[in-house]
Amino acid sequence: MPRTITIKGTGRADIKPDLIIIRLSVGSTDKNYEKASDAASERVTALKAALTGAGFSEDALRTSDFGVDTRYESIRDKDGNYRQEFAGYNCVYRLTISFASEPGNLSRAISAISSSGAEPEISVSFTIKDTTSAYTEALTNAAMNARAKAETLASASGASIGTLISIDYSDRRPDLVSPTNFRMADEAMPLMAAKCTVPDITPENINVTDTVTFTWEII
């Protein structure tokens, strides 16, 4: 039975975000389904028009999800008892727009969205276009880390490493998103409509970490 050494290598990559993704949610509620649907659609149209007017392409705003559910509200009757009463159909569009993380782009997009009158819920995330390169860099560093540790331990024991016997790796690939948060209360939307009030942000780098386990023969 050959002597072996098994080492877990850890690799990291520190990546600067180059892509901004804005996720929006707009909707409308009405007891008449057609009215609810039309009102929600009008908000989407207003968003597209505002973003196009700000210089973004006509197909920049994409629909990621459309849903319809029913809403009920608690009504107290004359006897003091509560009952559920139909409040209407709630039609909701979930949308995304992504663009390069360059000076002025975020400010331009938020200003356009805020001035559209659609009053969407907004979340902003900072990520990267080329995720493959980020994962590859982390994996390469993990392999180098494992080999360096194996060579150090073998040398300290008066031996050296030989043939690579096995590699054990679980491909987990977490989302590559900067920890920087961009939060905006609904009350701030009218203020954000003024371009001068929207700050440009330099987000924190994205830290990618991965691990791989290697087994070598000891000679």
Residues covered by each model-derived region:
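Short, charge-dense linear interaction motifs
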Residues: 1-219
